[in-house]
Design a protein with these regions (language model features):
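Alpha/propeptide regions of enzymes that mature by internal proteolysis
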Residues: 22-404
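Bacterial N-terminal signal peptides that target proteins for export
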Residues: 1-7
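Bacterial N-terminal signal peptides
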Residues: 7-18
Length: 404
């Protein structure tokens, strides 16, 4: 992450529940920095992947899951701390949508390498529940994002009739300081509110949007990527299978160029380039499923993100914050304290291998989508990060697979 060398600053951020007058900046990068082309994902370039994706090949294939962004892009040239250039944002993921904010989901958390932050996970580990949205931003905006989530939930959640309601939000980060004025604290509470308020199902953007705006992956322009897999589980040949979906969303900000492998092809070695002198970066991953799983089983799903990342070449370096959380939208209302007991459904451990496989496959594809559905970007001090060239990737994949 290269973030531990900065001096620590203490901020007191005061805000009410209403939005301030500043409108979130939702502009795309200047036209000169991007090509005006249609959305292109990895499969559009002929990249082969294992498994059967959901309809949208997205985390939003899991019914109820909603994703929202605030993208902050402004300024050019030399860094002026507090003014810019700004290349950052906020991502919000709501497990069962806006209509179920008061219904926690079973969840599990895993840290592959802990040079990072995902708040609230001590309580996820202890309770087995995720109680609200997941927000992802840059390293130095975790505090303001966490406070904003609490304020937003006070406004939009169930009335607090006791006066003792509390919240431990899940807010995660990766470092975008190569392109962004990260010490300028440009993410404000209203930016978090906007991402939460505008979260939706269906098709979502990838690449340099939301929290992924200023991120770098394998020394190409990185950011957000998503993918999904349909999973058929059956107990015997004589019973019809039940179909579930696993979806992965990640904020990709990791890896050296030479490590990059796509569909088994060492792409990074054939497209040389360098942004950093040493391994630097992180990955935040969110796994969603409608399969009925218990918290310990969801932790096992979260662990499998590691294998999907490894298929793209990363070794999860010392400076990497690789933090993963998984949740299930099944078993609604099981956290309701109005009943002494609840009846729940769960899949036996012996039948979980297809789910593990789906997470690995979707994670691998989500990383490549983050690289492909993207554009080159210039940020602070004219730092430039190129996007993965589509024509070259297509050529390398086609040549490699024609030789097999």
């Amino acid at each position: 992450m290269q973030k531990r060398t900065f001096a620590l600053l203490t901020l007191t951020v005061l805000f009410g529940l209403e939005l301030s007058g500043r409108e979130p900046i939702k502009s795309l990068p200047p036209v000169k920095q991007r090509a005006e082309t249609k959305i292109v994902r990895a499969r559009d370039l002929g990249v082969p992947f294992d498994g059967t994706p959901g309809k949208l090949n997205s985390i939003t294939d899991v019914p109820g899951v909603e994703v929202g962004y605030t993208t902050l892009i402004s300024g050019e040239g030399k860094l002026d701390v507090g003014k810019g250039p700004v290349r950052t944002g906020v991502t919000a993921i709501i497990p069962r949508g806006h209509d179920s904010l008061n219904d926690p989901v079973y969840a599990g958390y895993f840290s592959l390498n802990g040079n990072g932050e995902m708040t609230g996970t001590a309580w996820v580990d202890e309770s087995g529940f995720l109680e609200g949205p997941i927000v992802i931003t840059n390293t130095h905006s975790v505090g303001v994002a966490r406070d904003a989530v609490i304020a937003w939930r006070i406004k939009h959640g169930a009335p607090d009739t006791t006066g003792y309601w509390w919240s431990l939000p899940v807010v995660a980060e990766t470092w975008d300081g190569w392109l962004n004025d990260i010490n300028g604290f440009h993410v404000k509470p209203e930016d978090v509110f906007h991402a939460l308020d505008t979260a939706h199902g269906g098709v979502i953007e990838e690449g340099s949007v939301g929290g992924g705006t200023g991120m770098i992956c394998y020394e190409f322009k990185g950011g957000n990527g998503t993918a999904s897999r349909q999973i058929n589980i059956r107990t015997s040949k004589d019973t019809p299978p039940r179909t579930f979906v696993v979806g992965v969303f990640l904020q990709a900000n990791f890896g050296r160029r030479s490590q990059l492998v796509i569909a088994g092809v060492p792409v990074g070695k054939d497209i040389p380039g360098e942004v950093y002198k040493e391994e630097s970066g992180s990955c935040i991953a969110v796994v969603a499923t409608d399969a009925p799983l218990l918290p310990n089983q969801l932790k096992r799903l979260a662990k499998r993100v590691s294998l999907g990342l490894a298929r793209t070449g990363t070794v999860s370096g010392n400076g990497s914050g690789d933090l993963f959380i998984a949740f299930s939208t099944a078993n609604p209302n099981v956290a309701n304290p109005d009943r002494v007991t609840h009846t729940i459904q769960t899949i036996p451990n012996d039948l979980m291998d297809p789910l593990f496989t789906g997470v690995v496959q979707a994670t691998e594809e989500a990383v490549v989508n983050a690289l492909v559905d993207n554009h080159s970007m210039t940020g602070r001090d004219n730092h430039y990060v190129e996007a993965l060239p589509h024509d070259r990737l297509h050529e390398l994949i086609k040549h490699s697979h024609s030789m097999r």
